[in-house]
UniProtKB/Swiss-Prot annotation:
Positions in coiled-coil regions: none
A Pfam cross-reference name: PIN
InterPro entries named among the record's database cross-references: PIN-like_dom_sf, PIN_dom, Type_II_TA_system_RNase, VapC_family
Record's protein name: Ribonuclease VapC36
Family stated for the protein in its record: Belongs to the PINc/VapC protein family.
Cofactor(s) this protein requires: Mg(2+)
Species annotation: Mycobacterium tuberculosis (strain CDC 1551 / Oshkosh)
Keyword Transferase: no
Role: Toxic component of a type II toxin-antitoxin (TA) system. An RNase. Its cognate antitoxin is VapB36.
CDD domains assigned: PIN_MtVapC28-VapC30-like (cd09871)
Amino acid sequence: MIVDTSAVVALVQGERPHATLVAAALAGAHSPVMSAPTVAECLIVLTARHGPVARTIFERLRSEIGLSVSSFTAEHAAATQRAFLRYGKGRHRAALNFGDCMTYATAQLGHQPLLAVGNDFPQTDHEFRGVVGYWPGVA
């Protein structure tokens, strides 16, 4: 399962009902993954809300949920561009931003479910059940 920044932020902030849904999805997830650039985005968002302690908050959560960090390759960069061309802001109602496009690309290349909060990813080709999006035809 590929984890988006929005899911981590919802969990850390205790956003209801999303935090509960994210926690349940992570509890049932096998090897949740976040790409390295998404980790950077997540740390920036958490730092804006919590200050320098954000890294400690993130690392504790990462340890608790068994979140691994994946590399981001040239293939990921090309898939990110394709995601933007198809679903990017100003191009599609999903209006994916830069970080969203990177998460989408990581999920696409790994053909993994996507854990995210918000109305953007459900506007893509993922079939969402709660906070988890699946590729069409995959449950």
